[in-house]
Amino acid sequence: MKLATLCYIKKDGKTLMLHRTKKENDIHEGKWVGVGGKIEKGESPEECAIREVFEETGLKAEELKLRGLLTFPDFNNSEDWYGYLYVVEKFSGEIIESPEGDLKWVEDSKLFELDMWEGDELFMRWMMEDRMFSAKFVYDENEKMKDYSVTFYD
């Protein structure tokens, strides 16, 4: 079991997206995603999210809003992944060159034109509607979504 965080940083009707292009053997290669990563030993989800936002963007997240809990069973024929999904609207600092890929502010109206995971398209819509949810996304060996389920808490 892997625990992780995923953050979407928002400003002026735009979302900071990461185009994964720089890591070798990256399951997310070529996809547009939020920023985040694995929770380290002794770290809370919030501490992880703040650390990952800083490491990948150079920005200091000043306020996190929990929007969702994500479950990816047997992802990439590996372990189950569980994620905490946050929105960040209060932050400071300047964007750096990310070690993960290319960062770009994308108009919210253009987000779904990007190449992203099928499940991400679903949960980003819920996130943008300010809905709190718990969702499970099942992918096949070809990285296609086979099924999903969601519970809303609003």
Q: Locations of the language-model features?
A:
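Active-site-adjacent beta-strand/loop module that shapes the phosphate/pyrophosphate-binding cleft
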Residues: 72-94, 125-127, 131
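Conserved hydrophobic/aromatic beta-strand scaffold that supports enzyme active sites
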Residues: 8, 17, 83-87, 105
